[in-house]
Amino acid sequence: MDATAFHPSLWGDFFVKYKPPTAPKRGHMTQRAELLKEEVRKTLKAAANQIKNALDLIITLQRLGLDHHYENEISELLRFVYSSSDYDDKDLYVVSLRFYLLRKHGHCVSSDVFTSFKDEEGNFVVDDTKCLLSLYNAAYLRTHGEKVLDEAITFTRRQLEALLLDSLEPALADEVHLTLQTPLFRRLRILEAVNYIPIYGKEAGRNEAILELAKLNFNLAQLIYCEELKEITLWWKQLNVETNLSFIRDRIVECHFWMTGACCEPQYSLSRVIATKMTALITVLDDMMDTYSTTEEAMLLAEAIYRWEESAAELLPGYMKDFYLYLLKTIDSCGDELGPNRSFRTFYLKEMLKVFVRGSSQEIKWRNENYVPKTISEHLEHSGPTVGAFQVACSSFVGMGDNITKESFEWLLTYPELVKSLMNIARLLNDTASTKREQNAGHHVSTVQCYMLKHGTTMDEACDKIKELTEDSWKDMMELYLTPTEHPKLIAQTIVDFARTADYMYKETDGFTFSHTIKDMIAKLFVDPISLF
């Protein structure tokens, strides 16, 4: 058994008793928000006559976390924008924003529109900060072979970094910092709202109704998140982790933060709760099988999960037995929450867990045999499913509406290419963030070590290569996102959202394992309301 020690929970029982100070004002905030929604709806309809105004308004609503209130209006507007040529194709800001929004909404527009902004020597001609930001953000919706977008990223990054040395006005400087840290398309939508609301509040051309609605919308959502956290924390406490499972990562609040990053809308409350429980259970399985148990114990646990029956608990050592029975009980209770028409979906929760332990068993075998996969592709084939991204993304669909059909779940279990791109992004990001810690702890060979051993490189060189492969996987995802399927667009959108969460959690370090690195952001999302004044 590995003696790896993870730091204890940073939150404990905090959310069992906590209510944001806005809770007593909930009724008034809801009424005020409903009035403002209609006022903003009128503004959105009025913008339909001018493409630049429409694009500016749509991107503002998206960044403030308000777009889900106006899905039909925005879709209709963007269909008009897509079919219309009535815009200034010499304005790089407009061209970039049009490209960004249309691709983000699944319209396959050509990147050739950017070639006219290059001089005879092939260099971009841009001297405006807003244009640079717009081009940089648009370029990250690239697919394979779009050289002009690859060049745009290199050019604009260099220009934006230079601008930070100048004295930009505060709101613009904040924008440049945020953009260089993470391009707009890859940011978590709910965290973007938290970060952008104060920036938007500094803008001279802000719309006061939109700003007030954004603040109310966030504060109302925060109340829902805290109610979920109370329920989930009480569920988690029944495992008595501190006593019975002291060797695992106690990260229930971080699990919910992760799920909220991907499914932030209020109507997805059940989705967040189920996906959070699944993420926590997978974390326990991962730490048991990968870090703490003997090989024999890990294989017994895998066998029990394949059997999925209470009597299989008799196979297990004491520290696994109670967890296994609680796992079965939790999945059954998810069926009760889903109701008779959707309880069939718990079958897919079980199947996802079986996929996870099957992959974990393979990794244990590799570790015991000192086996190094011959290629990164071979590694990803087995290690992609064990990073957990597939399981948590699919479990989020379990709590969603009836538009996610049985056929959709069956399709997801075939590992469609879109799902593979998510697993690859998550695995590659995880490995670059945690490779030193895991290698020191005697884990199986990661994709980073696999590349080092096969190519004789240093760890830094291997990490650079893995980052290139991560970018390739993002391009794969974008191509697949733009490819129509018979399944609801919500599935593709949510899978992209989970890729964003992986990017956030593993950007600099393993933020899930070393959760003090994301504690301030968790507090911003769950603890601190946004002041209305």
UniProtKB/Swiss-Prot annotation:
Span(s) of short sequence motif DDXXD motif: 286-290
Pathway(s): Secondary metabolite biosynthesis; terpenoid biosynthesis
Catalytic reactions on record: (2E,6E)-farnesyl diphosphate = (E)-beta-farnesene + diphosphate
Cofactor(s) listed in the protein's UniProt record: Mg(2+); Co(2+); Mn(2+)
Residues where Mg(2+) 1 binds: 286, 290
Keywords of the record: Cytoplasm, Lyase, Magnesium, Manganese, Metal-binding, Plant defense
Location in the cell: Cytoplasm
InterPro entries listed in its UniProt record: Isoprenoid_synthase_dom_sf (IPR008949), Terpene_cyclase-like_1_C (IPR034741), Terpene_cyclase_plant_C1 (IPR044814), Terpene_synth_N (IPR001906), Terpene_synth_N_sf (IPR036965), Terpene_synthase-like (IPR050148), Terpene_synthase_metal-bd (IPR005630), Terpenoid_cyclase/PrenylTrfase (IPR008930)
GO process terms (BP): defense response; diterpenoid biosynthetic process
EC number: 4.2.3.47
Protein task: Sesquiterpene cyclase catalyzing the production of sixfold more beta-farnesene than alpha-bergamotene from farnesyl diphosphate. Involved in indirect defense by producing volatile signals attracting natural enemies of herbivores.
Family: Belongs to the terpene synthase family.
Recorded domain comment: The Asp-Asp-Xaa-Xaa-Asp/Glu (DDXXD/E) motif is important for the catalytic activity, presumably through binding to Mg(2+).
Identification of the protein by name: (E)-beta-farnesene synthase
Lineage: Eukaryota, Viridiplantae, Streptophyta, Embryophyta, Tracheophyta
